[in-house]
């Protein structure tokens, strides 16, 4: 990935598309506590459309936002997607209930939730798919290995990680 210090600049994903340095994080378009639908779905849809109309070409979401609500709203608002729009999603958190987050980065879980994200987003391939967190019960090589398999199958373009540090 390359970038400059200019906030209007772009980032180029390795070997892939160029996106605006400022994107839209879609976590908060779900309901309170990132659970369930928003109180005003039409407002959330209008926000997504306005962002794209204003030049945003990168939207970041996750299967756990809602759960599933954020991805569903993105598709309802923007499908068929405009040329150049990059949608990133994540897998590795589950939502047992409102206000509750649990980690699950087992390969079989990641494969399942990526498939569900593809369906909700109405995509054949997610351009950037990220491991949402590290699951200390699962060797990271197994979690990343599952994403590599999904990439080889053409279901994801690029692999990323979220909620990690250099330590």
Locations of regions flagged by a protein language model:
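A short alpha-helix capping/helix-coil boundary motif
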Residues: 25-28, 94, 125-127
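A short acidic, helix-capping loop that chelates divalent metal ions and anchors anionic groups
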Residues: 30-34, 94-101
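N-terminal binding-site loop/beta-alpha segment at the start of enzyme catalytic domains
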Residues: 1-86
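Conserved beta-strand positions
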Residues: 24, 61, 89, 128-131, ...
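Short beta->alpha linker loops
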Residues: 65, 69, 91, 135, ...
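Hydrophobic positions in alpha-helices of CheY-like receiver
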Residues: 78, 91, 147-150
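Glycine/proline-rich, positively charged
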Residues: 97-167
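A short, structured active-site edge motif that brings together acidic residues
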Residues: 84-97
